[in-house]
Amino acid sequence: METLTAGWVLPVTAPPLRDGRVAIEGGRVVWVGRGGDPDEPEAPVRRLGAGVLLPGLVNAHCHLELSHLAGQIPREGGFVAWVEALVATRGNVSENGIIDRAEAAIRALEEHGTVAVGDVSNTLVHLDLLWKSRLAAVVFLELLAWDSARAEATLEWAETRLAAVQGSLGPDLEVRLAAHAPHSVSPALLLRLRGRGGPAAVHLAESREESRFLVSGDGPWAEFLERRGQGHLAFAPPGVSPVRYLETLDVLHPRLVAAHCVQVDAEDRRVLARHGVHVVLCPRSNRNLLGETADAPALAAAGVPLALGTDSLASVETLDVLDDAVELHRRFPQLEPEGILRMATAGGAAALGLADLGAIAPGKRATLAYAPAEAVPDEPHRFLLSGEARLERVGAA
């Protein structure tokens, strides 16, 4: 057993503790309190300093296999132009190059206080890296097939791929089937995924182009499909928002992780809340690609469960979800700092179904993060969201 001390301990699911202490044993938290509490266990003390100890962060939406695209994709031409450039560029590197950059990204995550990821992959080429890492990972094997005739074959390929990697999985590494987005996956494939209890994740209501295509069937996304040789495929636009379209297909459920949700209205928010969908906000990526971000205060007020993610290095500078927490605080100063940090910890753990992460409490895993400080901060949450704090991983290996 060992006791960690810090200027502040932020359990997240309980009030913050000035001069807090956390006792850990066997990789688990066994006690949380203050020095001198009568029930404090006897154990050697490791004094971290004047800074802030908190649960390790959860990056609930990233794309590790796109890490080789850092700085490669122009962002100035709008969302569809960015997608088109990404599609054209992502294959211009060897598999070893993809793996090398993914490995570097995983190391950076580990070093800076992230303990779990919701990672979207089309290939699973880096699965072995995650197995060897210190991260808990839920990997979403993402399916794309706009042609309804390919739905069955696409799902068969995915199930074969899942069966092939079962021996590489474990308690800290899981693979679930996901759909890319409502405007890139055919209704036939979405319904087949529903038949398997999914999809487990989706990009949802990210861009205005997506919304326009589903309402009217035209616009920049329809033109993109035409350039891709898929403009001839029959599609009757549902005439509703992306959120309500997925509701009509009965694929919204409490285990669904929906990234972005920028283009949503009040009724969409009520739908998401009613179905218990976990929405992962990616404020830096949305800012960079769209010039706007999801209305986090309105989503929170509607009762939508919220988490934070970074998206990929093709659209942001780092995979540090603390940077997204800082951006969300800058964009929406009316949000309580405690709530933003909850999104980056407990919210992400809940979205990914990682019940033993996201908080400092007895029984939880002692995979923690520490932000050093020269003096004990007056307001620990605001200190973490100042843009000056940097995290390091502490606690259990």
Give residue ranges: language-model regions:
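C-terminal cap of metal-dependent C-N hydrolases
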Residues: 365-397
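Active-site beta-loop-alpha junctions enriched in small/polar residues
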Residues: 63, 122-123, 142-146, 180-182, ...
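N-terminal metal-binding scaffold of metallo-dependent hydrolase/deaminase domains
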Residues: 1-40
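Active-site metal-binding motif and surrounding structural segment of the metallo-beta-lactamase
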Residues: 36-54, 197
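Alpha-helical scaffold segments that flank or form the walls of functional sites
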Residues: 52-53, 70-134, 156-170
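Histidine/acidic residue-rich metal-binding segments in metalloenzymes
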Residues: 128-132, 155-278, 290-306
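Active-site gating loops and adjacent loop-to-helix segments of metal-dependent hydrolytic enzymes
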Residues: 68-100, 134, 138-144, 208-255, ...
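Histidine-centered catalytic micro-motifs
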Residues: 55-67, 199-208
